[in-house]
Every structure is written in C-alpha cells, then in structure tokens.
Amino acid sequence: MKKIQIAIDGPASSGKSTVAKIIARNLDLIYLDTGAMYRVATFVALQKETDDAKEIIEFIEKNPISFMNGQKGQEVLMGSENVTEVIRTNEVTNTVSKISAMTEIREFMVAEQQRIAKNGGIIMDGRDIGTVVLPKADLKIFLVASVDERAERRYKENLSKGIPTDLERLKIEISERDRKDSTRAISPLKQAEDAILLDSTGKTINEIVQFIEDKAKELM
C-alpha cells in the first residue's frame, strides 16, 4: 500500500482538524496539526510579551513541539509542558494570524513539517499545506463553509470546553481572520490549482470524511 500525503487547507473553523484526525485514525496515517504548531508559537509570543521571531524560535528549539495520543485524543506538547488547551484560547486565536505571518516563523515551521512528512503516510491541515508545505501532496482538499456555520461550530466547541463565548462576536472575528489570512503577504490562504474544492456547509462530518477517504483510497 502506497504511503500517501494528504493536504487539507481552508479557512478558520471549516472543520479541517476534526476531519483530518478522523481520517488519520481510520486510514492509519500520522496526523500533523500545523495550526497547533503556529498556535504554540503564538502562545510563546504572548507569554514572553514579544514579537521577536528569533526569540520565539529559539525558545521552541529548546522546547520542541511534539504530538501524542492522550485520553481525549491528540495532545500537544511544548518540551514537557502540555499546551493542548492553552493554545486554544480566544487570545491566541486572535493573535495567531500576526505571528504566523512572520517570515522567519513560517520558514522554521515549514521546514519542521516537511521533515516529518517526507516519508509519507501523513495527513496535514492548515492554510498553505497544498501550496507551500506539501506542494506535491498526492491528495489536496480545500475545505470551506459559510461564516455562520463556522461560527456556530466554534461556539459549540468553546461551550463544551467551558469557554465563555459570544456567537455574534465570533462571526466578526472569523470574518476578520478570513481577511487577514487571505491578504497576508507571506503564504496567503488560497486554493491550490490541483486541489478539490469541498464546501462543508450543511454537510455532516461523516459525509466529509467519507468523501475524502474515498478519494484517498483510490491513491493508496
């Protein structure tokens, strides 16, 4: 069986991570959460109150990002510290576009992601996987959904974690995040020419997963 690379790109809260994790489990692939890696860098920036890319990178090099399967699914570590929950706060969410747009940060993260992915058998999701990180991925999906649907998903997710959230505020934040991600100078959010456009509005997670798995199995 061929060890393929799957790239899933799309805007914030379009369901990329949820879908990628399920597919990774079903098809026995490694799931590399690229968004979490940039969130870790953002968390470091906020903790250290710095926007110096070199300082952020040096700290992460001393406390490498890694992933492990925990009781509630995949957990994110920075060195020995479990940062799974703290990198999902609204403060991190609203700052991650700024940090991830830094050239030095992106180059560092892309090199790390490519190193992990080079042997295949991997699925990655993010903003520029199919265009920058894995331009030769076997299967590329560009997953989108309406702002209202994405806000509703994030709202329910935050409530389930006990995070106080205002739905209308979320809609504004997601729209602004879309604008930032699509217009930034470095690796803007855009669909790769050879990616399959998949609109998840009104679709269940199972329907999305099944569609992508069927495409993947044709290549394996």
Curated annotation (Swiss-Prot):
A Gene Ontology molecular function term of the record: dCMP kinase activity
Keyword annotations from UniProtKB, A to Z: ATP-binding, Cytoplasm, Kinase, Nucleotide-binding, Transferase
Keyword Chloroplast annotated: no
Annotated residues for binding of ATP: G10, P11, A12, S13, S14, G15, K16, S17, T18
Source organism superkingdom: Bacteria
InterPro entries in the cross-refs: Cytidylate_kin, Cytidylate_kinase_dom, P-loop_NTPase
Enzyme class: transferase
Chemical reaction(s) catalysed: CMP + ATP = CDP + ADP; dCMP + ATP = dCDP + ADP
An individual GO BP term: nucleobase-containing small molecule interconversion
EC number per UniProt: 2.7.4.25
One term under GO cellular component: cytosol
Subcellular location: Cytoplasm
Keyword NADP: no
Sequence similarity: Belongs to the cytidylate kinase family. Type 1 subfamily.
Protein's UniProt name: Cytidylate kinase
The organism of origin for this protein: Lactococcus lactis subsp. lactis (strain IL1403) (Streptococcus lactis)
